Amino acid sequence: MSFALYGLGPSTGLHDNDESDTLYKLNLAYMPKENQTWYATVSEGFRRGGVNAVPTEGSFIEEAGWVPFASDSVLNLEFGAKGITKRDVFYNMSIYRIDWNDPQLNTDTPNYSFYAVINGDEAQTTGLDIELKGSVGKIDWDLGYARNKSDLRADLVTPASVPSIYAPKGAGLPGTPEDMVNVGLAYTSYLDNGWGIVHRANMYYQSDMKNHLSTSLGYSQLLDSFTIGDISSTLFSDDMYVSFFVKNLMNERGVTGMFKSESFGPNPAAGFYGSNDREFIALPRTVGISIEKSF
């Protein structure tokens, strides 16, 4: 594959793939009580393969093995229970396991650091989700917790003519915090004129996580944990809502992704004078008023 870069060479490339199979899903549910359900789900998933925009001719050449990547598939197992307790607390709890076969993983090429997807051998995700909702007087509350662990179950090997280990077995998959918590409170009251007012406070927390699968310090960075809080007050009637809100009350930076300057910044030696380094951050503190009217 070649492509025009700095006006050099034609843009060409052709790769085909054709796959056909059947995906299965089985769900079983049992109600031991009227307000309680147990369930189990087994399902399969598939994602097609593709090609990377990696040059193999002309300038900035990479090996041809970095161009195509194959499909991947998953087997998902999930067990859970949901219902309502005697104190009117709604709950939804589940545990799950996802086995990845030939997982498509984001990497970079060795010569000029082009973005490239390659196939690993095996990966696995395990976790649990807990959701609770209830009321105490005029206060409605909700609580959520998620635990997630995702890692490689075999070394990730590059598709080069002389393969090398890009990430070792046991390496955690990027972009997946192990712990996430959300809490919400809402207090509702009514005025003599028929209008109501509801005050809300919400909090979200996530633990630290990796931004990149590579073990190279030029790419990999452990992103800090963060907590984001929102508050709002809404005056409402049957056909109108007036809300005052503050999002990200503490103005938390909340970095969820990063392209480090060491690898994505200027590199005059390679003829690159621009910069592609950046961070993905949470919405900064935002204060506002919204008005809705139904007609």
Language model segments and positions:
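Residue-level signature of outer-membrane beta-barrel architecture
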Residues: 28-31, 44, 71, 81-83, ...
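Outer-membrane beta-barrel signature, preferentially recognizing the C-terminal barrel domain
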Residues: 16-17, 23, 36, 45-100, ...
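Signature of Gram-negative outer-membrane beta-barrel scaffolds
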Residues: 1-33
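Extracytoplasmic loops and strand-loop junctions of Gram-negative outer membrane beta-barrel proteins
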Residues: 4-12, 58-65, 110-116, 163-171, ...
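C-terminal beta-signal and adjacent terminal beta-strands/loops
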Residues: 203-214, 234-295
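Outer-membrane beta-barrel translocator domains and adjoining extracellular loop/strand segments
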Residues: 1-2, 51-58, 103-111, 148, ...
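Gram-negative outer-membrane beta-barrel transporters
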Residues: 90-100, 118-213, 290-294
